[in-house]
Amino acid sequence: MSSDERQIAFFLDFENIALGVREKKKLRFDIDLMLQRLLEKGKILVKRAYGDWSRYKAYRQDLHTAAIELIEIPQRSYSGKNSADIRLVVDAMDLCYSKEHVDTFAIASGDSDFSPLVSKLRENAKYVIGLGVENSTSDLLVENCDEFIFYEDLIRSQKTPLKQHNIPAKKAEAFEVVISSIRALEREGKTAIWASMVKETVKRKKPSFAESHYGYSSFSKLLEEAENLKLLQLKRDERSGSYLISHLS
């Protein structure tokens, strides 16, 4: 494990996010967009979603496939709108105190009621990432988090740079996950991006990834072909012999 690899707990206030996305008439909530962005930052050790699942049956399978634990908060038990919020807060603070190795909490909600939770987590030296929907997220919540990611930005960041390169579909799949991982490292402010760092990020995003599946004897060979296709530029470190990614096309 890299020393800077975050150990993440993800908590999803599903109703808040689902309603926010529903207001964007052309959007359907895709949990994978959030999880993939978090996997660029580290390992997700805990994944929980809170809501009345009898009202959101259409989403249950996607959440189960993503290995998210569904916490049932029946609507009939609501005392106002805060029952799911209260359970999420209790679970997050319990995890904060009982699992010291979890250093990052990702809270998916736009509700200002979570601002005290964010403050308490930060008091306990936890890094807090917020995720929400534009125009339905509290400014107070955004300002309280160490980092805030809007769902619409996740959609906008989905790029398909390989269409114009006429690359076979199987190899394009490999290059796309590599390039998205390099962009993730750039977003995290990494000034030197080593091939090994890219490989670690790729494996978090796609645990089954193996360069041999795409016809390459090593990850370096895959990167070399990407350079030949002008997808990126490589620079070999003279001391270690390892590759640095110097530029993305």
Which residue stretches match the model-derived regions?
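Acidic beta-strand-to-loop metal/phosphate-binding motif
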Residues: 50-52, 103-110, 117, 121, ...
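N-terminal regulatory modules in eukaryotic regulatory proteins
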Residues: 131, 161-249
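Domain-level signal for Mg2+-assisted phosphodiester chemistry and nucleotide/NA-binding surfaces
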Residues: 1-97, 117-119, 127
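Intrinsically disordered, low-complexity linkers and terminal tails enriched in Pro/Gly
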Residues: 1-4, 152-172
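Contiguous mid-protein beta-loop-alpha structural module that forms a pocket-lining wall or clamp
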Residues: 137-156
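Short, structured coil segments at secondary-structure junctions
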Residues: 66, 124, 143-145
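Short, glycine/polar-rich helix-capping loops at beta-to-alpha or helix-loop-helix junctions
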Residues: 56-60, 133-141
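Short, well-ordered beta-strand core segments
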Residues: 70, 105, 128, 148-149
